[in-house]
Regions:
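Short, cationic low-complexity segments
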Residues: 196-219
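Short flexible loop/turn segments that cap and initiate beta-strands
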Residues: 232-262
């Protein structure tokens, strides 16, 4: 919707060259915080294509700063973007004047998802926008031709609503979601970034990061066992993370305000690890951090922080 005066004082040319294709059926989107914590405006750098664009998009989806990250929502069902009728004022003679465009919303559903996933998306507490993904992997957002950046279309985040519908005898569980686009945005300002500009990655296949939970047991100075699971699973049987490595873990010493990678990580099976490290003393307060990025299609990055423990 755009309520701003955009008329240039003349009609615009209406010719269309051969080969122009519209954006396709929407099947996914990236949720993008409008601003990062440092005040910068989030966008995708599209100044270079091919592997450079692959790297730029992977870097956004796996950004270590959560306020600069893109959050993929894939495999959306029943996507619609309805727009209300415009508002007109009419005089006594029947002459109408357009006052404003109708409000545009977006609705979609997730099918067969758990309540744990629902908890991840039930509320949006920061201003955000969306970059849409169609069934071919094309992206749609607001393009800054001078700065060569693709920005999200801003959403009225206060209008965001999601609810959980239980599985029934003839229907799977569903999560219907709806929100309104910001009133100052317009379909006319959205520009497509073609899948052909990427090299090895597909926006349709880049998955979101996974949250981890930890149970830490101190063994001795410089040694712990850690049970590391995903947030998904059932009571007493969460799904274990089996991909911990030295490079993916950091031991943070809160007492000395220092951090370092472990010296050794041994997988004991089913997400249980023996982790050894140096640079700590008895009584120090420590915690464990995990962060591992996805590097290709169909991979998930992971992140999580443990609770604090006291060194033996």
């Amino acid at each position: 919707m755009s309520n701003c005066i955009t008329c240039a004082g003349y009609l615009k040319n209406t010719g269309v060259p051969a080969g122009v294709k519209p954006f396709g059926r929407i099947v996914g989107m990236y949720l993008v915080p409008i601003n990062a914590d440092d005040g910068s405006v989030n966008s995708l750098d599209v100044s270079a294509f091919g592997t450079a664009l692959d790297t730029a998009l992977l870097g956004r989806i796996n950004n270590a700063d959560a306020s600069k990250r893109f959050y993929p929502l894939l495999d959306l069902k029943n996507v619609e973007a309805p727009q209300e009728d415009a508002t007109f004022e009419e005089d006594s003679a029947g002459t109408r004047v357009k006052v404003r465009d109708g409000r545009q919303s977006m609705t979609y559903e997730f099918w067969g998802q758990s309540r744990q996933f629902f908890k991840q998306i039930v509320g949006m507490c920061v201003p955000f926008g969306v970059i849409l993904i169609d069934e071919c992997g094309n992206l749609l957002g607001e393009y800054d031709e001078v700065g060569e950046k693709l920005y999200p279309r801003e959403v009225n985040y206060a209008s965001y609503d999601a609810k959980y519908l239980n599985t029934t005898a003839d229907a799977t569980s569903k999560i219907p979601v709806t929100f309104d686009f910001a009133l100052f945005t317009s379909e006319a300002d959205q520009v497509m970034l073609s899948i052909s500009q990427f090299s090895a990655v597909s926006p349709l296949k880049l998955k979101g990061m996974l949250d981890l939970v930890f149970t830490i047991t101190p063994v001795a100075t410089g040694s712990i066992t850690a049970q590391i699971n995903f947030i998904y699973g059932t009571v007493g049987a969460k799904i274990p993370w089996k991909g911990a490595t030295i490079s993916a873990l950091t031991v943070v010493n809160e007492t000395t305000v220092s951090s370092a990678s472990p010296t050794a990580v041994t997988h004991n099976g089913d997400g249980n690890y023996t982790i050894t490290y140096s640079g700590s003393s008895a009584g120090n307060k420590l915690h464990l951090e995990a962060f591992k990025t996805a590097t290709a299609n169909n991979e998930n990055g992971v992140e999580g922080n443990s609770a604090q423990w006291t060194e033996l």
